[in-house]
Amino acid sequence: MNYLQYYPTDVINGEGTRCTLFVSGCTHACKGCYNQKSWSFSAGVLFDDVMEQQIINDLKDTRIKRQGLTLSGGDPLHPLNVETLLPFVQRVKRECPDKDIWVWTGYKLDELDKQQRAMLPYIDVLIDGKFIQEQADPSLVWRGSANQIIHRFKL
């Protein structure tokens, strides 16, 4: 899996101060998507053990208290990304149990397959649904369009 961008300190993509990883690869091709450069699975750089350890280290860093990890993209729940992200979120929950995990996906919760659903026990907040430009509303919190739903599983 590739990722396009990593922000070790982010206050935009979820509650509190967070680490945010924008993964590469999305097949939804939403009209008006703000991150079209993330659609290609080959965009960005390889998410390797070094990057994974960096995120764990940042989450544990007591100099800047982070509430959790955000996964966006691209689409973190695309099956090609789940292969890499499932063991990663398992590790985050194991090594940083006090941190929450937020995930943005174009898939709807009721559309997820078995592989994608395997991620759910490790996700605290899931924002689902494709971005629909005709339903775009800049006043929405954590969502780009009115069809998207915020699912709070744990918090």
From Swiss-Prot:
Species whose genome carries this gene: Haemophilus influenzae (strain ATCC 51907 / DSM 11121 / KW20 / Rd)
Record-listed [4Fe-4S] cluster binding positions: 26, 30, 33
Role summary: Activation of anaerobic ribonucleoside-triphosphate reductase under anaerobic conditions by generation of an organic free radical, using S-adenosylmethionine and reduced flavodoxin as cosubstrates to produce 5'-deoxy-adenosine.
GO molecular function: 4 iron, 4 sulfur cluster binding; [formate-C-acetyltransferase]-activating enzyme activity; metal ion binding
Main subcellular localisation: cytoplasm
PANTHER family cross-referenced by the UniProt entry: ANAEROBIC RIBONUCLEOSIDE-TRIPHOSPHATE REDUCTASE-ACTIVATING PROTEIN, PYRUVATE FORMATE-LYASE-ACTIVATING ENZYME
Protein name per UniProt: Anaerobic ribonucleoside-triphosphate reductase-activating protein
The keyword Kinase appears for this protein: no
